[in-house]
Amino acid sequence: MSSSLPQHYRDILLELGENPEREGLLDTPKRASKAMQYLCHGYTQTVEEIVNGALFASDNDEMVIVQNIELYSLCEHHLLPFIGKAHVAYIPTGKVLGLSKIARIVDMFARRLQIQENLTKQIADSIQQVTGAAGVAVVIEAQHMCMMMRGVEKQNSTMNTSVMLGAFRESSTTRMEFLQLIGRSRT
């Protein structure tokens, strides 16, 4: 743990007019530091470490989807959480990725200071790079505390982002199949 991070949290408490010596706040700087390091531990990981060789030969060339992957991230503008789900698909070309690796890739990028638009693209690009897939699709739907707790204070708003690569971008049929399978299409 960075030795200066707890002191910075203590300084924040002082700037807010709080007494960091009162009973409820005595260990808050240390706890907040540990929490922030956990919430941002994606910076200490790489896609290569996560995949760890879990690519398996396969003659499957049909769509693979992992949906409803819970994600928690911090908005890079306000350091407030956004919480949602990722839906990830790819079309294999000779190899498939270990199932848990997709969720771990989502987590790695989510555990960084982010904006949802970049998070969606980073997930898609990394899965494309690792698998060499014929196409990758990522849809993320999330609620942003920076919009719910402050600013416009819209409690029921949800942000949706998508990135479509390869076959998902080039073929409306493939894209629609994915969106229908994750329950996101309107017919």
Curated annotation (Swiss-Prot):
The keyword Hydrolase applies. GO terms for molecular function: GTP binding; GTP cyclohydrolase I activity; zinc ion binding. Pathway: Cofactor biosynthesis; 7,8-dihydroneopterin triphosphate biosynthesis; 7,8-dihydroneopterin triphosphate from GTP: step 1/1. Its EC number is 3.5.4.16. One of its GO terms (biological process) is one-carbon metabolic process. The keyword Hydrolase applies. It catalyses: GTP + H2O = 7,8-dihydroneopterin 3'-triphosphate + formate + H(+). Pfam families: GTP_cyclohydroI. GO terms for cellular component: cytoplasm. Keywords: GTP-binding, Hydrolase, Nucleotide-binding, One-carbon metabolism. It is an enzyme of class 3 (hydrolase). It comes from the Bacteria. Belongs to the GTP cyclohydrolase I family. PANTHER family: GTP CYCLOHYDROLASE 1, GTP CYCLOHYDROLASE I. Homomer. This is GTP cyclohydrolase 1 1.
